[in-house]
Regions:
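PLP-dependent class I/II
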Residues: 1-328
Length: 328
């Protein structure tokens, strides 16, 4: 199994990049891409579904092409294509109307939907789930049905009761209100701080993290990563841990080194018998990012779910002072 990075733009995976990569499976997080926070709009979601469906039927000839949302792309093979939709914090949309998941738009059985209760109930609960297309579900039962479930029956029954009663939905609604308040407070304090004129907050409308970009010091990947690390070190000395965007690259690439950063998602090309390969590359799929060759602003992945509201002014002040100190 080969794992290949796929370019992202402001709306998600780039269709032409999918065709060039000649992949069979795209792993994506359309509700809230990590680490950029991009939410894929419905129009791009439909285009991704059309890409997945276009791999099912054999092309009419070697030069065959298909129109996907007005773009001409080659139908590169007759192999089945799938989208793995990792919807890891879809419950926490902070602004705007909810966007339907790929699985809800899929009418051809091309989406493998996966989610977890780690964000809503806590990581210690360790319950996740996957919804397979019917054809794949049958193959899963035939080939892997001997695997025992690692989640105890008591935990499953308790969660089922919690959901059936409506208490789970009420719990998530309360969490969403609480997190929205924390998000608003953090952004307001940072914007009003001494570094506020240099900060831009991107993709804060969904999920439990957003990007804080620093204006005025845009450089190449190495320059931006170096600036990020210096700011992070200053904040760490005072007890605040920042997550520089430059750290999100394939294993083995150091911050600022030639390699991969944050503007891509991941696709795989699979041979028919390479089921085991999925396990070997799982970590790479979750950490996959992009070619780090362009220019970008320094940025930080800002999580806020664990912040208490009374600590936000202090934390924001430390972050602001670290940025100002490096800006000089």
């Amino acid at each position: 199994m080969a794992v290949r990075p796929i370019a992202l733009d402001g709306e998600g995976p780039v269709l032409e990049a999918l065709e060039r990569a000649r992949i069979d499976v795209l792993h994506c997080t359309p509700s809230h891409q990590f680490p950029t926070g991009i939410t894929v709009p419905v129009s791009r979601r439909r285009s991704l579904l059309e890409w997945a469906q276009s791999g099912v039927a054999a092309p009419e000839d070697g030069a065959a092409a298909r129109e996907i949302r007005g773009r001409s792309v080659k139908a590169s093979s007759a192999r089945s294509r799938y989208l793995i939709e990792d919807d890891f914090d879809c419950e926490f949309r902070m602004a705007g109307r909810p966007v339907p998941p790929l699985a809800a738009l899929d009418g051809a059985g091309r989406v493998i939907y996966a989610n977890t209760f780690s964000k809503t109930l806590g990581g210690a609960f360790r319950i996740g789930y996957m919804v397979l297309p019917e054809a794949l579900a049958e193959r899963f039962r035939d080939r892997l049905g001997f695997y025992a479930c690692t989640v105890g029956a008591l935990e499953q029954l308790t969660l089922a009761r919690f959901m059936e009663s409506g208490d789970y939905e009420r719990h998530v609604n309360r969490q969403r209100t609480r997190y929205r308040r924390r998000l608003s407070a953090l952004i307001d304090v940072l914007a009003a701080s001494s570094a506020g004129d240099h900060l831009h907050f991107a993709n804060a409308g969904a999920g439990l993290h957003f990007l804080m970009e620093v204006r005025g010091v845009e450089g190449d990947e190495r320059d931006s990563a170096t600036f990020e690390e210096r700011v992070a070190r200053r904040a760490a000395i005072r007890g605040v841990r920042l997550a520089p965007l430059g750290r999100y690259r394939f294993t083995g690439c150091e911050a600022g080194a030639p390699g991969r950063s944050s503007n891509e998602t991941v696709g795989c090309r699979c041979e028919a018998r390479e089921v085991e390969g999925a396990r070997r590359v799982c970590d790479e799929v979750r950490s996959g990012c992009s070619e780090g060759r362009g220019r970008r602003r320094p940025a930080f992945v800002m999580g806020f779910s664990s912040l208490e509201e009374e600590t936000i002014p202090e934390v924001a002040g430390i972050v602001s002072e670290a940025v100002v100190a490096e800006l000089g």
